[in-house]
């Protein structure tokens, strides 16, 4: 049912999202991440998977679909892990490199984030650009990507990051220069 008042509470879910609102919402609820994990099928034995994500409880899932429409990309999925309100958690995730390059990065460059998340975005965008050029497929480039990725969403002291299984155990393939990549990743060098 549509209200006579176009800005009334009844029409809040029907209106298209405003860019400024999206920036504020992502500042509070969004995440830019660059996980790097072992994958023997990749040339260097490591896979880099940058992702922009927003997570909400089941009662707010409509906003994720609105963001998906707004950006023109991404996948909304359910995770049956419950939050403290016993709801399923839903997430909008954008992983396709082309979608990140064409939709997500240009938007946040035009409408900058206002919190500390702006720094995470800058590092995230740098990684995506390096990947677009194929740097993550070279030993030195993978080390550079890993170094930049280690600065994103850093809430743990570096010694905890160093103890991660993905960092401790090299892939089960012989890659020339692999030790250099792992060493630069462990120590945050580029």
Regions found by a protein language model. Name each.
Residues 1-190:
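Sequence-level preference for short, compositionally simple segments enriched
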């Amino acid at each position: 049912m549509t209200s006579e008042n176009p800005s009334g509470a009844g029409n809040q879910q029907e209106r298209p999202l405003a860019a400024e609102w999206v920036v504020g919402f992502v500042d509070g609820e969004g995440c830019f991440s660059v996980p790097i994990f072992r994958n023997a099928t990749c040339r260097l034995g490591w896979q880099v998977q940058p992702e922009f994500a927003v997570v909400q409880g089941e009662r707010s899932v409509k906003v994720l679909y609105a963001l998906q429409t707004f950006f023109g990309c991404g996948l909304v999925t359910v995770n049956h892990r419950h939050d403290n309100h016993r709801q399923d958690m839903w997430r909008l995730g954008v992983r396709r490199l082309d979608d990140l390059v064409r939709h997500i990065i240009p938007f946040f460059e035009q409408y900058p984030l206002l919190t500390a998340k702006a720094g995470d975005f800058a590092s995230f965008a740098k990684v995506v650009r390096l990947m677009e050029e194929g740097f993550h497929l070279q030993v030195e480039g993978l080390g550079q990507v890993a170094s930049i990725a280690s600065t994103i969403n850093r809430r743990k002291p570096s010694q905890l990051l160093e103890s991660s299984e993905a960092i401790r155990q090299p892939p089960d393939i012989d890659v020339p220069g692999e030790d250099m990549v792992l060493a630069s990743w462990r120590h945050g060098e580029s």
